[in-house]
Amino acid sequence: MKIFRNNIWENHLQSVVPNEVKWSYWNDCFPIPDGEVCFNVMTGSLVLMSNSEYENLLKAKECTSKLWELGLFADVKKDEYREWLNTYREGKNDESFLDLTFLTSRQCQFKCTYCFEGLKPKKDLTDETISHIKSFLEKRKGSFQKLQVYWFGGEPLIGYNKIITLSDYIIRFCDNNGIEYDSSITTNGYALTRERCEELVKSCRISRYVITVDGTEEVHNQRRPLLSGKGTFKTIWQNIHWLVDFGAHVVFRITIDKENADNIPLLLDKIAQSSLAGKVSIALARTFEILNTPEDLGSKVYSEREFAPVEMKLIDYAHSLGLMNYRLPHKAPLGGCLRKGDITIGTDGEIYKCLDTIGEMKWVTGSIDKIDSEPQPQWYKDYLNWTPDDSNQCRGCKLQPLCSGGCPHNAMFSDKMHGSVLQCPDWKPNYRLQIERYIKEKIEKNEFDLL
């Protein structure tokens, strides 16, 4: 048996092995040419065994301490699924970790060909909302130990001064109260300058920047021009270099459909041949068609089934250039986006639970100034009570601890303004292929332990 990854998530399993054990419910096993893969989604351990080893383990009534530590076996008396489901329910009430998204502006200076937001209102984060955000945090002082802030829009940099003002307060608040702080931004990257890059990274402590680049210069400029029609690629490319120079982690988000898929390898070549190689991350995303997207988009987008091989081919190519690693999925926070501490705050203080519903008033759950006293709409109460066990698609799936049931909004409701209408996470279609390639690479490098 080859061990490629040990228990990294459930260290309590390094205890005494019980007298009676069973094969863990959370073992996701599948064959590859080299044998049988077993990935335990609760512990994160990953092993490869021969077919005979696998058959023998399935029949085993006892196990070694190492197999127990890996999580491949569980106490025979334990209902692993029900125990996880109860933990999931408890996780929804966890407010020790606040995950706040701020919409600094609903405006945008781009005219992207696939934009979902339609006519963008001229709204920026109000001073009154900023005051209410401060009060919200002050009231919760001492109840949480970590704060993650996401800056979003529209285009959040249109509200640049709001980011500066609110960041200054939040950083002082966290430092004075011993709260761990982390901050990220999703931006088109155009309104940055060298001075702004330095201020955002060093003063505002925004460490992660998700910036969409949809191809090489000609293709990107066709898809993501300014409202005036002017191209944006050169400016964004320079700004990304400045961010990296100041120590930021930049993620190239590449939105892919049938119009630009063939151009993406050329973009990857450009990144690999630049000083950005090894310093940035790549995130491949499928273009979605939904509600407010342009009418002619339908024939250009990939279905989930169509996109999976396209994505895997690009992952392989990016890997060959040293731009991407084959990835094993991470565990989602217990309770997922249903957690009480996970909210999105709009420009006027309105609260959403899902980024994909921004701008639709029917999905507003309340307001930041009355969050503890305002009556909740019935749909929201039902939403908060949802668990993966309520979904036919989730029930019986062994990947639940990794995705926390995926998107509960898509599981319960059929309409929203934008984003995927699928419940499952976007990494799922190529999940096993990535594991297979990960194992093959580790074998070639002789990076594994034997048992």
Residue ranges and their predicted role:
Residues K2, E218, Q222-W237, H241-K340, ...:
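Radical SAM enzyme [4Fe-4S]-AdoMet core and its adjacent flexible, acidic
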Residues S15-L48, C63-T101:
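N-terminal [4Fe-4S]-dependent radical SAM core
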Residues V47, Y352-K353:
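Generic structural signal for well-ordered beta-strand positions
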Residues E90-F116, K134, K141-Y150, I345, ...:
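N-terminal pre-triad scaffold of radical SAM enzymes
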Residues T101, S105, G118-L284:
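Conserved glycine-rich "GG(E/T)P / GGGxP" loop and the immediately following alpha-helix
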Residues Q107-E117, D356, S391-N410, D426:
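Local cysteine-cluster metal-coordination motifs and their immediate loop/turn environment
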Residues S135-E155, V421-L451:
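Short Fe-S-cluster ligation motifs
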Residues V301-K331, D356-S404:
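C-terminal accessory region of radical SAM enzymes
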